[in-house]
Regions:
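Thiol-/selenol-based redox modules, centered on thioredoxin-like
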Residues: 168-209
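Structural micro-motif
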Residues: 143, 162-173
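Short active-site neighborhood of thiol/selenol oxidoreductases, capturing the structured segment around
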Residues: 77-107
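Hydrophobic alpha-helical segments, especially N-terminal targeting/anchoring helices
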Residues: 69-70, 175
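Residue-level signal for well-ordered, solvent-exposed loop/turn and beta-edge residues enriched
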Residues: 74-75, 180
Length: 209
């Protein structure tokens, strides 16, 4: 019962916000964006702009110590403590939208070319229950899903939390085996996909180090 109540309380506002951002709609061929903006600056959807709140992460720095919730186990996960493997962080506003769904399918399907030693992780502010449902329906349960649903602490600690919506900005972050951030792309126009192929190539290079 508690799970159902939590799902309803959080799920409906998140869907309405995502729809307002223009991510949802019929599936179509998605454009990939090669450009990036810095965490802590701003992103856009058409003429609308969204300031990125919080403390920006940077290349060569470690991830902040923040607890996320694993969708499958409901256990807390602190990615700053996860060393020994390359982390491929695919960060999306909401899995209940077409662009975010496409990004996650790309991670799960095209990402098979990347070594299994690279941990492919999707992070969003969807509830863990919504993430788990998506994973099962999309047949992408081999990915790890981490939820920032409580307070948006991960978004604020990385400079990736969009104002007005309080959703995470569409981005990819790669962390090397020592826990250092080595790659960041924050998509300037959130209706476009990140350059997943470039990120895959970089992840493979980091895995060989």
């Amino acid at each position: 019962m508690a799970e159902r109540v939590l799902r309803v309380i959080w799920y409906l506002p998140m869907v309405f916000l995502a729809l307002a951002l223009g991510c949802a709609g019929a599936k179509a061929k998605m454009a990939m964006e090669s450009q990036s903006v810095d965490p802590g600056t701003s992103v856009a959807r058409g003429e609308a702009r969204f300031q990125l709140l919080g403390s920006p992460v940077a290349l060569g720095k470690s991830l902040p110590a923040v607890k996320l919730v694993d969708a499958m186990t409901l256990k807390d996960v602190d990615l700053s403590q996860e060393k020994g493997s390359v982390l491929f962080l695919s960060i999306v506003p909401s899995l209940d939208t077409a662009v975010c769904e496409a990004q996650t399918h790309y991670l799960g399907e095209e990402g098979e070319k990347v070594s299994k030693d690279v941990r492919r992780i999707t992070i969003s502010r969807d509830t863990p229950f919504a993430q788990k449902r998506f994973a099962k329906e999309a047949k992408l349960t081999h990915l790890q899903y981490l939820s920032d649903y409580k307070e948006g602490e991960f978004g604020r600690a990385t400079g990736l939390l969009m104002d007005k919506t309080l959703l995470l900005a569409r981005s990819v972050v790669l962390v090397d085996k020592k826990g250092m951030i080595r790659y960041i792309q924050v998509v300037p126009e959130i209706t476009r996909l990140p350059d997943m192929e470039k990120a895959f190539q970089t992840a493979m290079e980091l895995n060989r180090e």
